[in-house]
């Protein structure tokens, strides 16, 4: 029996009935979306203690280890020593161009160059996923492998091969750190409410910084000491060099790996109500202008961030300038200034975190820039160990405030679905300047001296300060007024 309804008997809906049906479907969709948002919020608060502990342990142990590598003392000094003794194979003309200062700048630039592209590629691979933890663990593991490679290179290589290996591992470290930063910050943004992010970062950085400051001093004074690299000994038929820098890097690898393990075991990640559809990297790059036009505050924030990072061209040369002025670049000197830098970084975290939670991170961003300018001026005026100690303390506090403020402010602009790509674009802009900055700084130092590098740095920080004061509104205030979606 044919039950097909003849065309002339098919009921035709009036425009009013169609509108009512669409309105009903829209209301149902909005109800489902509201229910999903409520479930998402309930999951976050129900698992807050566990996720808080996971982020705390990961930050305390992970950042402790990374600070041993990223402190403006060990790696610049190590590269300077290697470049001073490992460039003999070059022709005389090239040796004049490849000065130790230029090699220091090149090494720090290579560490940053990976962050130019890898954040966007990483974000494109995770923004469509409801769970990003597996990608975070993979990127974190690959990042730590590079630090292990730096350690083994120092034990088994010497001279030019060791210098080349260090430059390679610094490049790979930057490559994986760019993608890791996006993934881990995205997890933080998903599991920790914005009203708790400041104090979490404050306490994890504070406790981790205490450990890092103590380890930095101990590594400089006792592990590296006065003779960081010695003649090889034989172990299992292999020639192994005693290298205090390698031992320090291996210690950093162990600490960061413990933090990553704790994070993987404890974290509980929710499924967000909405995610972006998967898109090609080229399509996301074409979407950058639209993303910036849709949020003027974020666009100017990225400009300010770029200028602030450009001001870091001087960072690798702080310790070299202090060593040249004091006529000492010994392990003890590295340990003392590393202690000042990381100690102030540690102590100031409580200020930055609680200030950010209470007033928003725009205020801490501004104060950090003022600290940076003041610390650089003090460094220029210093001629004694106590004065340099104070200058490194100011610079450490500034670095801490900038990192916490910039990374947290990015999470508070715009829509949640765009968070991964905002992190990626922000990291890429930072990576461009971070990769070019030390290289340009090294060339300036080789041609015009350290002071010109410092004056250039101050100029960029002043520009960043002006942009934030006059062009960037506190994103949390806009969110509370309903201009952006949570």
Show where each model-derived region lies:
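Helix-loop boundary and gating motifs at the non-cytosolic
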Residues: 30-117, 122, 126, 136-140, ...
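Helix-loop junctions at membrane interfaces in 12-TM secondary transporters
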Residues: 152-169, 380-391
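Helix-to-loop junctions at the C-terminal end of transmembrane segments
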Residues: 118-131, 223, 347-360, 445
């Amino acid at each position: 029996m044919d039950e097909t309804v003849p065309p002339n008997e098919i009921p035709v809906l009036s425009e009013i009935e169609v509108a009512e049906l669409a309105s009903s479907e829209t209301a149902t969709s909005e109800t489902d979306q509201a229910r999903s948002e409520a479930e998402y919020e309930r999951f976050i608060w129900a698992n807050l203690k566990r996720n808080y502990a996971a982020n705390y342990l990961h930050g305390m142990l992970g950042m402790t280890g990374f600070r041993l590598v990223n402190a403006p003392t060990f790696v610049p000094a190590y590269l300077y020593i290697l470049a001073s003794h490992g460039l003999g194979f070059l022709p005389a003309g090239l040796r004049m161009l490849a000065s130790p200062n230029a090699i220091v700048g090149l090494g720090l630039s290579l560490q940053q160059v990976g962050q130019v592209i890898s954040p966007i590629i990483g974000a494109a691979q995770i923004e469509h996923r409801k769970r990003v933890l597996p990608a975070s663990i993979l990127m974190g593991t690959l990042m730590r492998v590079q630090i292990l490679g730096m350690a083994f290179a120092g034990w088994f290589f010497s001279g030019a091969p060791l210098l080349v290996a260090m430059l390679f591992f610094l490049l790979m470290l930057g490559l994986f750190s760019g993608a890791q930063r996006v993934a881990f910050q995205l997890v933080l943004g998903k599991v920790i409410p914005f009203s708790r992010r400041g104090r979490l970062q404050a306490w994890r950085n504070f406790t981790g910084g205490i450990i890092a400051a103590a380890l930095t001093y101990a590594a400089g004074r006792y592990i590296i000491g006065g003779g960081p690299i010695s003649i090889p000994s034989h172990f299992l038929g292999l020639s192994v060099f005693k290298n205090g820098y390698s031992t320090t890097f291996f210690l950093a690898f162990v600490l960061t790996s413990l933090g990553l393990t704790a994070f993987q075991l404890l974290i509980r990640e929710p499924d967000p109500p909405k995610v972006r559809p998967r898109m090609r990297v080229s399509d996301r790059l074409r979407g950058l202008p639209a993303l910036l036009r849709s949020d003027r505050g974020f666009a100017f924030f990225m400009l300010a961030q770029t200028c602030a990072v450009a001001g870091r061209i001087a960072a690798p040369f702080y310790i070299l300038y202090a060593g040249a002025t004091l006529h000492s670049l010994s392990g003890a000197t590295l340990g003392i200034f590393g202690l000042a830098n990381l100690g102030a970084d540690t102590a100031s975290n409580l200020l930055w975190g609680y200030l950010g939670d209470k007033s928003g991170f725009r205020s801490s961003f501004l104060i950090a820039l003022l600290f940076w300018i003041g610390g650089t001026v003090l460094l220029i005026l210093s001629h004694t160990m106590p004065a340099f100690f104070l200058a490194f303390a100011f610079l450490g506090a500034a670095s801490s405030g900038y990192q916490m403020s910039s990374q947290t402010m990015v999470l508070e602009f715009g829509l949640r679905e765009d968070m991964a790509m905002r992190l990626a674009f922000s990291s890429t802009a930072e990576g461009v300047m971070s990769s070019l900055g030390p290289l340009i700084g090294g060339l300036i130092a080789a041609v015009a001296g350290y002071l010109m590098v410092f004056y250039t740095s101050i100029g960029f920080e002043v520009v960043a300060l002006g942009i934030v004061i006059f062009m960037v509104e506190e994103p949390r205030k806009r969110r509370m007024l309903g201009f952006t979606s949570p």
